[in-house]
């Protein structure tokens, strides 16, 4: 029996971003770790910086073929400015049509909010976040 199976949107975006930023020549992105998890560091924060958390805030599925998800990109860095810059870089990379073309299943990504900087209330470390809405083709699996 074959059936459409929803995709883990956060993991798909994390894979797409790892590939998209691999060739990025920007010192603020040097050593950036991209993950769908955080919480193993001090006070529940990331284990290292710079760190990008890819999380899913909302998800809908237009059965059987298309999913839509709101993705939150949270960047921790050494300064609020650098965190905001990383959030902007990865948001731009995600919304670049070349990223969708290079990522099987990712049809489109559009910005939902611009990067905003803040301080992590749990760790006191600088962070920034942005959101994007992604459209994903749902694969058929047997």
Per-region residue spans from a language model:
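Short, charged interaction patches at domain edges and termini
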Residues: 1-19, 57-66, 105-142
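Small/polar-rich, solvent-exposed N-terminal microdomains that initiate assembly or binding
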Residues: 1-62, 101
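Short, solvent-exposed beta-strand edge segments and adjacent coil->beta transition regions
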Residues: 68-72
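Structural beta->alpha junctions
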Residues: 73-79
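Short, conserved charged micro-motifs
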Residues: 81-85
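A common structural junction motif
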Residues: 91-101
């Amino acid at each position: 029996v074959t059936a459409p199976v929803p995709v883990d949107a956060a993991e798909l975006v994390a894979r797409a971003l790892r590939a998209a930023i691999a060739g990025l020549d920007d010192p603020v992105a040097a050593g950036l770790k991209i993950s769908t998890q955080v919480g193993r560091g001090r006070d529940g924060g990331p284990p290292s910086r710079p760190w990008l958390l890819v999380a899913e805030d909302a998800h809908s599925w237009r059965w059987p073929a298309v999913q839509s998800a709101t993705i939150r990109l949270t960047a921790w860095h050494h300064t609020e400015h650098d965190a905001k810059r990383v959030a902007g870089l990865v948001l731009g990379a995600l919304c670049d049509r070349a990223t969708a073309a290079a990522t099987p299943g990712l049809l489109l990504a559009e910005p939902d909010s611009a990067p905003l900087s803040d301080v992590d209330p749990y760790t006191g470390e600088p962070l920034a976040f942005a959101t994007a809405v992604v459209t994903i083709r749902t694969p058929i699996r047997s």
